[in-house]
């Protein structure tokens, strides 16, 4: 039987500088969803990558006395290093400088031109180099970019334009017919208001930028970086040559993006697909920003956070957990090291870590390290575990990672409460209570096994550590990711150091800028 497919993407990240917390947030969220869908037996295709053309990169390379390709190669290595450290499980990493992407973009651009949706005109207005965005004078205050607040440049040049205005009604109709196309609801309402306002055709080429894909019918122009970038979602599937892969996975089930690029994904991208007569993605989820003291995190503001420094100090899974637990996905969140340390000490150390440590200590003390086996009818936490499993499914469907984790920690709380109520240390004092002691510790072991499956999408390393200590993993065996499995008779625990040792206040990092 063929598995049901699930195609999800992050944006491809602009490589004018090294990756920061915002890049890692989007990618960790996508990775958690990909891992969850895999253990639900979906055939997952998870795409991420890098956006490597444009004026900003051309200027950044010049400032470093490098060619553009030398510059982007050096930055792409840093993205790959961070993704490896974060245990990102992407199925493909696309680069817009790759030959196959460039060839496919040219073909698609040519198709848009032949359909009459691209024409040569003259653009006169303002352009933001850092955001690679065109703006009308009427959209600006004091010539400042509405997104990054930097001063825009006055531009007047011949450009090729895409007939975006032609698709205004079709876009509105599509949004009304697909009310869940953009999530969360507040973002959808914002973008709908913009679509209802007059929409102008957009410039999709540059004549003064050399670093880009040449326009196929006019090599004196290069294709605007945002059109080049958006097309990655279909070029990665080999839309022209390997049509089987494209037919298998498209349309994408979800594009996970930051809210600042919703116009491109929620308006321009659907219109381009409509022109190409390609189905639109099923969902776009635009999450919020991380802030420090209420300001968006960015290197230019001097408040960027270095993910590698956090990982080195606090661990990968603690970082992944914090980002996905601290803030409901879709809202803005404020980052602070004290908040991170509190989550580690309270949630990971006290709640989860102590549950594992106490359970294993009692199994070691009362059963010589062999996990007592219980049957379902004796397992008093099993129905709560099933409820948790079902709640997680609902939250993950809505990309509500924080609420999914809240449900997991509620179950962890039930397991800790179960220890206090059953008092296994008291049961151990009477041989007559041995059957009860077997039931209690066997129930706790099975609860921990279920917890290890629940947390896997968010904290895969911790899942491995728990399952190894529960005696489930041989030297080369794979993780046990099926829900509510029974222990084999004679399974012996392998107690190790605490999962998350307590962090003292004096070891807390201060806010630090991304390292050069």
Model-derived segments and spans:
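Structured secondary-structure scaffolds
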Residues: 1-48, 100-104, 155-365, 406-408
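Basic, alpha-helical terminal appendages of large translation-related enzymes
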Residues: 1-5, 45, 49, 121-126, ...
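Short, glycine- and charge-enriched coil/turn segments that flank and shape catalytic ligand pockets
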Residues: 2, 142-143, 177-179, 218, ...
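N-terminal, positively charged nucleic-acid-binding surface of large information/translation enzymes
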Residues: 2-180
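A non-catalytic, amphipathic alpha-helix used as a structural packing/dimerization or gating element
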Residues: 32, 70-81, 351-358, 387, ...
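Residue-level recognition of alpha-helical structural elements
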Residues: 68, 184-187, 348, 374-381, ...
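Active-site-proximal binding-pocket segments
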Residues: 262, 323-326, 330, 339, ...
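Amphipathic alpha-helix face/heptad-repeat signature
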Residues: 344, 348-351, 355, 377, ...
